[in-house]
Amino acid sequence: FQLILIITLPAQILAKDYYVYCAAESEDEVALIRFDGKKAYVEKRIQVGVWPVEIEGPHGITISPEGDYWYLSMAHGTPYGHLYKYKTGTDEMVDRVELGLFPASMEISNSTGLLYVVNFNLHGSHEEKSTVSIVDPEEMIEIDRVETGVMPHGSRLLNSGMKHYSVAMMSGELFEIDAMRMAVSRKIHTKPINNMKNHGMHNMSHKNAKKMDHSHMMSNSDKKGMAAMGHM
């Protein structure tokens, strides 16, 4: 009888909404998207960053295990990027901390509670090794940087939260970091990708973007304005 009752309940009663934060790197904007099981709706557009007339480039995004806060890496800087902390619900900026060159993908460990974010580093000749920043997301303090390979990207942890993995894009090496020791515990050479150096085209697009006149793209400048500068 209970099974029949559940099946015959109206669909709207059983429906559950899911929410996703989605970053738009070219707009300095994060969209809060609601999915009701059938369709997706943009519930809110959140202007992020503190520079009212510059593109800061929101790249990586993750949410705290409790769902109280969400974190955003801002790739562009002078020259270093930042990690931003926002409150879910109000989506107000709480704090930020400076990291390395072009911080990108990130994830929070279930075991340590720390946040691991790769410093992708699109600058320069792409021959220098970069790092993974380890951040205390409660206090918003960078507590360590672990050197890995050239242009590390991707940031994933085991379900246990004990091992962190990222890939050095220019060499194809997979780096394993011991989350407790905060040190590289293993380096795995993956199969070389054909024409890996063609990734330089991606770099060229970023270089060209930096040379472009963004004035015609600043549709968000009025929205951010000097009020955003108050977060600095």
At which residue positions do the language-model features occur?
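Predominantly soluble domains enriched in secretory-pathway, periplasmic, or organellar proteins
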Residues: 11-232
